[in-house]
Amino acid sequence: MCKTILVVGASGYVGSHLVPELLNKGHRVKATGRNLQLLRKRGWNDLEHLELIHLDLSDNSDLTDLLHDVDIVYFLVHGMNHGHDFIDFELECARHFSQYLEKSHVEQVIYLGALQSEDAASTHLIARKETGNILRSSGKTIIELRAGIIIGPGSAAFEVMRDFVSHLPVMLTPKWVTSRNSPIALRNLLFYLTELIKKPTHESMIFDVAGPEQLTYREQMVRLGKLINKKIRVIPLKFLSPALAAYWLRFITSVPTNIARALINGLQYDLPADGSKLQAYIPQVLISYDDAVAEALEMNDEIIDSEIWGFDPDALSRWQPDYGYYPKQAGYTLKTDASCEDLWRQVQLVGGDEGYFFANGLWRLREWMDAMIGGNALERYRRDPNHLELGDRIDSWKVISLEENHFLSLLFGMKAPGLGRLEFTINDHGEYRTIDIRAWWHPKGFKGLLYWFAMMPAHLFIFRGMTHQLVKRCKAKAKDGQIDTV
């Protein structure tokens, strides 16, 4: 039977896979996120029976219309990327949603939480448990699935482990590597989530979600290393706390630092799971850890075969399995009174004889460095000096996405350990416009991360200068510039 389903937090990892599954099963889906552009870049904009809705639960907006015709809700919101105060942010979002949920005609809420340990003091785990309690206070039927590590491409916990294995031949780790948990394959989790719709009930329930094996993090990383032909040594150190380990995370993994830090702080506890109750309720064949990892590695190129990269064949052919799934980024945003049209007119002049608006000497130096290792960055080229089209080559760059007066994305063409792109984004905010210049980088192993951090000071210096110079060329005013790095 077709249902109207609201997916709250569709821009997250599980939501990005759950929404297509629900559509394939014939349901009408409302997918919400704080960044609709991210949802659109997945190619969701024109899908039948899918409605994309901007939703920021922290702004205390009225949710009556959102919940009006909804039968089932999937609540997938978490605040790990919010920063040090994410627990307060997460619980406040849950309270706000629960307030309107209580007054709605929603039949059932399926909430994806986290496995719990009796002695756990992790803020991440506490927040997940308390969110479930808040949702139950609405009086609605709440089905809470408590999951541990999800094995799939883009799963933050899985990607942290994969980056550790790919980047470090020897790992000096906190003693949490001996903690045990029950990792589950993404495919198994999605089956549980979607089959729950077929089990109508008026009784709230809590289920542990567990794969077929109880493994330590050390065992998982060693087995992952074997599957990618990477021999590693894991050496636990009692004096190395998770808090201390969290400080160097940004230099080892491309997973966003706030998320990785929150996860690491929860890894020090055993998270035993008894999945027998859920298996009896919704039987399925559970995939082994090794098979789940192999499946995740086969799906790894899904990040590149997307609208974010313009479905570009050159980007797809250059992607390698050991590239970081999550990109590093660095950019500079500037407010201005210049029009979108004037800014776009200048952005289209990038490259060729015109150069790059600012610090052209540094651009030339980088091009010479590329030439010295066999690259072709010294070959200056533009099809047209004034206008750009999709697929155009600009020196060593390639136009992979273009939206007039708003957006330009260039595929990085020089030799370096990773894959990247350079984006120009113009947004109209009514009283002012913003111009943002940003580099995105998927590092190849530890060398790729070293390259990124070595180049970051130059990136920030150049992007700041480029944005100001673009505004100056428009004979306009600029104010409130802002640096952003992840």
Predicted regions: what they are:
Residues 290-294, 443, 448-486:
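A conserved amphipathic terminal alpha-helix motif
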Residues 335-344, 348-417, 469:
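Glycine-rich portal/gate segments that line the openings of hydrophobic small-molecule binding cavities
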Residues 5-25:
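N-terminal Rossmann NAD(P)H-binding glycine-rich loop of SDR-like oxidoreductase domains
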Residues 79-167:
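Glycine-/Pro-rich loop/turn segments that contact NAD(P) or position catalytic residues
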Residues 93, 156-157, 176-197, 205:
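Substrate-positioning beta->alpha
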